[in-house]
């Protein structure tokens, strides 16, 4: 059961699956990326890849699992409410509370509050930057600052980023459009992510390979 498509969560799946031969559950964008990984291994995963709708539910024997939409730097990050015979477990996956998400849906804070009110036996939580005080900045702030920089520059602009940081990729597309530039993606992972975006969202179509 996959929460989102970052490499540290799905990178080993095509290597492990031949030994496990199990069903894989994922939301649409994550599922498209997984298919691409299995294609590289010449494995047809179609019949074992189960696509779960956003905020959807699945049943696995004694476990009832509910997907909860969160916000992060990639499309379709999900938390999991796992109902077990012993009680409810909340697995957050990776998340970042962004009041102005530039990609995907807003965090389903209403459902998270309901789950908290209902009672949770244990929460398994992403802890990146847990020792940093204050709030994380919004990608909207990055977009504004980056656009100001790009507008001041007259020649080629090179932007580095993790390929799976879809929010940053979208910011780069936005800045290119507003400044009258074209985008050239460099790297196999960048092209893979972009191709998957074309299948599942309204990604920019003015990219130079």
Language-model features: locations:
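Core dinuclear metal-dependent hydrolase active-site scaffold
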Residues: 53-112, 116, 177-179, 209
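A short acidic, amphipathic alpha-helical/loop segment
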Residues: 12-19, 78, 171-175
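Cap/insert and terminal regions of metallo-dependent hydrolase folds
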Residues: 29, 99-188
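Conserved P-loop/Walker A NTP-binding site and adjacent catalytic elements of P-loop NTPases
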Residues: 27, 34-37
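Active-site metal-binding motif and surrounding structural segment of the metallo-beta-lactamase
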Residues: 1-26, 114-123
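Catalytic metal-binding/acid-base residues of hydrolase active sites
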Residues: 6, 96, 128
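Divalent metal-coordination and catalytic microenvironments
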Residues: 4-5, 65, 72, 94, ...
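Single conserved hydrophobic/aromatic residue that forms the stacking wall/gate
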Residues: 199-208
